[in-house]
From Swiss-Prot:
Residues that, per the record, bind Mg(2+): E46, D75
GO terms under biological process: nucleotide metabolic process; purine nucleoside triphosphate catabolic process
Reaction equation(s) it catalyzes: XTP + H2O = XMP + diphosphate + H(+); dITP + H2O = dIMP + diphosphate + H(+); ITP + H2O = IMP + diphosphate + H(+)
Residues forming the catalytic site: D75
Subunit structure of this chain's protein: Homodimer.
SUPFAM superfamilies for the chain: ITPase-like
E.C. designation(s): 3.6.1.66
InterPro entries for the chain: dITP/XTP_pyrophosphatase, ITPase-like_fam, RdgB/HAM1
Necessary cofactors: Mg(2+)
Name listed for the protein in its UniProt record: dITP/XTP pyrophosphatase
Hydrolase among keywords: yes
CDD domains, alphabetized: HAM1
Keyword Nucleotide-binding (UniProt): yes
Species name: Deinococcus deserti (strain DSM 17065 / CIP 109153 / LMG 22923 / VCD115)
Length: 208
């Protein structure tokens, strides 16, 4: 695959089973004319990494190798100041709670009586190629945590999080409004910018 040609019109696998993430990624990267497809029968490895980068790479590389196609994966998390950065990479399984609602309630209980509600969302997006090359993009969004959920849109901790400069929670915003300011939206915007003129240069030469 030569630089300058890029992935226009090519199939790219989205390595996630989260339908909410798939919708965000499809809309955010619409300008690249990529043909985004799901995982099909591919099973992703467990997220055993200690960082967002490690977890995203695990998923993207597994999908790229299994499908023989470029694959895109995201790992993200909520980092709460009063909890020393928890839940972080464990956001999707915080407190071993089974679903978003239970995890939100668990977080609110952990913060009961806490005046410091500062937090940030972090997202790392990795595009992996079958030859092992990786591209990494990172985005962050800072804000405050509410004392109770608000809104019906979004997923995860969206009902509890009000971004800086906003009065609404992420769950009270449309997908488009959220994408324009979100951590994942910022990481995907960086990816789109890097690919707008074709494949970005590889920092390490690949020897055939």
């Amino acid at each position: 695959m030569t630089e300058g040609v890029g992935l226009k019109g090519r199939q790219v696998v989205v390595a996630t089973g989260n339908a909410g993430k798939v919708r965000e990624i499809e809309q955010a990267l619409a300008g690249l004319d990529w043909r985004l497809t799901g995982l099909g029968s591919v099973t992703l490895p467990e997220e055993t990494g200690a960082t967002y980068e490690e977890n995203a790479a695990l998923k993207a590389c597994a999908a790229a190798v299994a499908c023989g196609l470029p694959a895109l994966a995201d790992d993200s998390g909520l980092e709460v100041e009063a909890l020393d950065g928890q839940p972080g990479v464990y956001s999707a399984r915080f407190g071993n709670r089974p679903n978003d609602r239970e995890r939100n309630l668990y977080l609110l209980e952990k913060l009961r009586g806490e005046t410091n509600r500062r937090a940030k969302f972090v997202s790392v997006v990795i595009l992996a190629y079958p030859d092992g090359h990786l591209e990494t993009y990172r985005g962050e969004m800072t804000g405050q945590l509410l004392e109770g959920p608000r809104g019906e849109n979004g997923f995860g901790y969206d009902p509890l999080f009000v971004p800086d400069g906003e009065t609404r929670s992420l769950a009270e915003m449309t997908v488009e409004e959220k994408r324009a300011i979100s951590h994942r939206g910022r990481a995907l915007a960086a990816l789109q910018a890097a690919h707008k003129d074709g494949l970005p240069p590889r920092q390490v030469s690949v020897i055939d």
